Amino acid sequence: MPSISTNIILAFITALLGMLIFRSHLMSSLLCLEGMMLSMFILSTLTILNLHFTASFMMPILLLVFAACEAAVGLALLVTVSNTYGLDYIQNLNLLQC
């Protein structure tokens, strides 16, 4: 179990570093966010099953619901920005540039 947890934590850190490095494009940021949410889901599921937390069996499901909502809003924003500006740069999302 510790090696699985270590690998999942490393996957989360890798996605976080990818978010910090590739922050200019919206699509790259969304992919890194999805990787972070997936690693958080797997880690929370393994922790709950391993430690027998019967009161918190719904937490991974709620995490998946929020991840799906985040993905839907992110893709809608990506389509809107791509249709408006023709690019998917995050700098186009600044409201002060109007």
From Swiss-Prot:
Places the protein is found: Mitochondrion inner membrane
Gene designation per UniProt: MT-ND4L
GO biological process, one term: ATP synthesis coupled electron transport
Membrane-traversing stretches: 2-22, 29-49, 61-81
Disulfide topology: none
InterPro entries assigned to the protein according to its UniProt record, in alphabetical order: NADH_UbQ_OxRdtase_chain4L/K, NUOK/Mnh_C1-like
GO cellular component: mitochondrial inner membrane; respiratory chain complex I
Catalytic activity: a ubiquinone + NADH + 5 H(+)(in) = a ubiquinol + NAD(+) + 4 H(+)(out)
Its membrane topology: Multi-pass membrane protein
UniProt key word Transport: yes
GO molecular function: NADH dehydrogenase (ubiquinone) activity
The name this protein goes by in its record: NADH-ubiquinone oxidoreductase chain 4L
Subunit comment: Core subunit of respiratory chain NADH dehydrogenase (Complex I) which is composed of 45 different subunits.
Endpoints of the signal sequence: none
Keywords of the record: Electron transport, Membrane, Mitochondrion, Mitochondrion inner membrane, NAD, Respiratory chain, Translocase, Transmembrane, Transmembrane helix, Transport, Ubiquinone
Function: Core subunit of the mitochondrial membrane respiratory chain NADH dehydrogenase (Complex I) which catalyzes electron transfer from NADH through the respiratory chain, using ubiquinone as an electron acceptor. Part of the enzyme membrane arm which is embedded in the lipid bilayer and involved in proton translocation.
Keyword Transmembrane helix carried by entry: yes
Organism domain of life: Eukaryota
EC number: 7.1.1.2
Family: Belongs to the complex I subunit 4L family.
One Pfam family in the UniProt entry: Oxidored_q2
